[in-house]
């Protein structure tokens, strides 16, 4: 027979366990909201720095906090502007809400700061009428077999990174309007972004336009996981998910796991 004492101890233990569980959940949520958040990248606009189905970790505190950077609460207008704001640097890879579609998140490289004059001439970036250093360093063949020319670029602050351009086919250059642009004057409080995949990126040269500082969510830091194919899909059903599990595991890109996004040794 269970005594009142035993019942009391059982209830106390259950409460302690639930309390511990709730505490862990709260800590995890706080970490995600304030410190670090994982993101999945579904598109190739940053290829080959970031590939489709790369999973990245980003730091939320790098630029301070705005309404858009607070996970789970970004749909509630809690406040305007940023608190604990820190200025971004040229060359940062930033996760942000595009001003023309707040339902999605973009990831691009920050090129232009407030007050800058930006233009691309024959694929070379000019910042305040000075062209950046740009050297062709080889080629990149994508998983789909598409050939890209690979360039090493250096921004005025010394930040270096790789950009990629579709190789000409029979001498024909792909998407010349991306290679030669109008002049862009970056307004105060806003920023100019480019994708590292220069011919296949919806960035500040075209539909995106300038991005307000308030729309910044986080600074991308490193890849923590990567696969060639997507496993989870709400539309394919449980049986197909099970069948897809093995090829998904086999598609893991082991050479990309824990890759620093700012490493230019590769």
From Swiss-Prot:
Pfam families linked to this entry: Peptidase_S26
Cell compartment(s), UniProt: Cell membrane
E.C. numbers: 3.4.21.89
GO biological process, one term: signal peptide processing
Gene Ontology molecular functions: serine-type endopeptidase activity
Chain ranges passing through the membrane: 21-41
Record's catalysed reaction(s): Cleavage of hydrophobic, N-terminal signal or leader sequences from secreted and periplasmic proteins
Main localisation: membrane
This protein's record includes keyword DNA repair: no
Extracellular side: 42-266
Active site: 45, 108
Name of the featured protein: Signal peptidase I
Species of the source: Rickettsia conorii (strain ATCC VR-613 / Malish 7)
Species lineage: Bacteria, Pseudomonadati, Pseudomonadota, Alphaproteobacteria, Rickettsiales
């Amino acid at each position: 027979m269970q005594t009142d004492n035993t019942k009391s101890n059982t209830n106390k233990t259950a409460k302690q366990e639930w309390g511990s569980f709730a505490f862990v959940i709260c800590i995890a949520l706080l970490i995600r909201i304030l410190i670090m958040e994982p993101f999945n990248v579904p598109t190739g606009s940053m290829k080959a720095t970031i590939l489709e189905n790369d999973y990245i970790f980003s730091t939320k505190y790098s630029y301070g906090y705005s309404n858009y950077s607070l996970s789970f609460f970004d749909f509630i207008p809690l406040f305007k502007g940023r608190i604990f704001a820190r200025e971004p640097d040229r060359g940062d890879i930033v996760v942000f809400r595009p001003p023309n579609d707040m339902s999605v998140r973009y990831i691009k490289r920050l090129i232009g700061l407030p007050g800058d004059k930006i233009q691309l001439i024959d694929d070379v970036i000019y910042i305040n009428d000075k062209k950046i250093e740009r050297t062709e360093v080889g080629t990149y063949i994508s998983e789909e077999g598409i050939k890209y020319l690979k360039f090493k670029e250096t921004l005025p602050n010394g930040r270096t990174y790789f950009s990629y351009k579709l190789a000409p086919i029979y001498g024909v250059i792909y998407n010349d309007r991306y290679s030669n642009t109008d002049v862009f004057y970056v307004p105060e409080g806003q920023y100019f972004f480019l994708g590292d995949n220069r011919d296949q990126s919806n960035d500040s040269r075209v539909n995106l336009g300038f991005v307000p500082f308030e729309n910044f969510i986080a600074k991308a830091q490193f890849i923590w996981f990567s696969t060639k194919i997507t496993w989870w899909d709400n539309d394919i059903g449980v049986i197909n998910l099970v069948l897809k599990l093995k090829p998904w595991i086999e598609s893991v890109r082991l050479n990309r796991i824990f890759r620093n996004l700012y490493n230019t040794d590769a």
